């Protein structure tokens, strides 16, 4: 159902069963998939592609220009998967040509009120962004990561899968998979064991991850020496391989 008071560009492509509430504005070069619900007073600009079964609440701004002073109106994109929820006043920006030109959001994510995803970010699946999370540009967030309220993330940071960021954390370094961090600046506070249990990790897998955490953070080893030990463990433990691969891909150093 399209409310008569909504303003929709003739160039927008909406599936027949999309719902758009009153006073929302859908711009040209926007594609919205089946059963997606756009609430009242929402703005969606493009080029933006939104998948199926998404829910966008009032006052959200989806797919507008990046907040980057170098941006000069280039035709960059935003791509959103399926079954995401964007609560009140979320802001999700398109990419820039200084990166891949696209901001990417996976599926089954929850973005609570006033959360902000900046240009060129890559968000995985099943993440939670609590109220007023603020992301810099070019940030990567792995699957199942949870970011508490008022978390602030510096540009180019990588947050690993299953990581947990406590409320108010200020992050300027990469967070490895499975690790909990909190504080300003954010520092590690152990393994997100409860989250791993809820997602079906076995006791043995969690024990291996705890062992890896001790090697990385509690052994007084240099990072290169810790990485050598972790690499040996990863040969038979896929959950440790994910940690090793993340460390190799880190460009801003790890929280310590």
Where are these regions (language model features)?
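Terminal amphipathic alpha-helical/low-complexity segments used for targeting or macromolecular assembly
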Residues: 1-5, 10-11, 16-17, 53, ...
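Structural signal for interior beta-strand "rungs" in well-ordered beta-sheet cores
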Residues: 2-182, 186-187
């Amino acid at each position: 159902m399209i409310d008569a008071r909504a303003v929709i560009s003739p160039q927008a492509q909406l599936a027949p069963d999309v719902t758009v509430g009153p006073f929302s504005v859908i711009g040209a070069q926007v594609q919205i998939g089946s059963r997606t619900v756009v609430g009242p007073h929402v703005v969606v600009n493009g080029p933006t592609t939104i998948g199926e079964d998404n829910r966008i609440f009032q006052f959200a701004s989806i797919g507008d220009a990046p907040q980057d002073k170098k941006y000069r109106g280039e035709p960059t994109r935003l791509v959103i998967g399926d079954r995401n929820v964007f609560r009140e006043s979320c802001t999700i920006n398109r990419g820039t040509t200084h990166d891949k030109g696209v901001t990417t959001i996976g599926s089954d994510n929850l973005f609570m009120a006033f959360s902000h995803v900046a240009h060129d970010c890559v968000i995985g699946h099943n993440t939670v962004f609590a109220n007023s999370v603020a992301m810099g540009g070019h940030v990567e967030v792995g699957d199942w990561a949870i970011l508490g309220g008022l978390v602030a993330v510096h540009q180019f940071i990588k947050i690993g899968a299953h990581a947990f960021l406590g409320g108010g954390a200020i992050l300027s370094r990469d967070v490895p998979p499975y690790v909990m961090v909190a504080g300003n600046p954010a520092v590690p506070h152990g393994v997100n064991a409860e989250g791993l249990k809820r997602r079906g990790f076995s006791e043995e897998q969690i024990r291996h991850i705890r062992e890896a955490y001790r090697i990385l953070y509690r052994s007084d080893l240099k990072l290169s020496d810790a990485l050598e030990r972790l690499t040996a463990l990863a040969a038979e433990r896929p959950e440790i391989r994910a940690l090793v691969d993340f460390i190799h891909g880190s460009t801003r150093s790890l929280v310590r």
